[in-house]
Design a protein with these regions (language model features):
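N-terminal Rossmann-like NAD(P)+-binding domain of SDR-like oxidoreductases, especially those catalyzing
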Residues: 1-127
Length: 127
């Protein structure tokens, strides 16, 4: 059975992907910050917390990545700031999360012992 890390797993795409992969027999770990902007009701978190290993953390934080990649075979990196309009005036934050977090992931994978064999990256239109 494969271990899959999904960043942004409590978002719309991540939530639906998580359910599908669990149905197919995968072990899922989610790394998500549960941003109030996206997850005001936390309904997806409530549905996922008992069927996944759920890490409430930040994809811009090295320690959260190091914790999340432990024993993973695949990373599906969906975490991103969303909203094209907001990305036009909150440039630093969007760049930090949507580009910087991916760089952080690659740095952690390159410089630590891990079992990750595949990365799937889905980007936001707000990059």
């Amino acid at each position: 059975m494969k271990n899959v890390l999904i960043t942004g797993g409590a978002g719309f795409i991540g939530f639906n992907l998580t359910k599908r992969l669990i149905d197919c027999g995968y072990n899922i770990t989610i790394l998500d910050n549960l941003s109030k902007k996206i997850h005001s009701s936390n309904i997806r978190y409530i549905k996922l917390k008992d069927i996944t290993h759920f890490i409430i953390g930040d994809v811009c934080n090295r320690a959260d990545w190091e914790k999340a990649i432990c024993n993973q075979d695949v990373i599906i990196h969906l975490a991103a700031e969303t909203g094209t309009g907001q990305s036009m005036y909150d440039i630093h934050n969007y760049t930090n999360v949507n580009v910087g977090a991916t760089a952080m992931m690659l740095d952690v994978l390159t410089n630590s012992k891990n079992s990750v064999k595949k990365i799937i990256l889905a980007s936001s239109r707000a990059v």
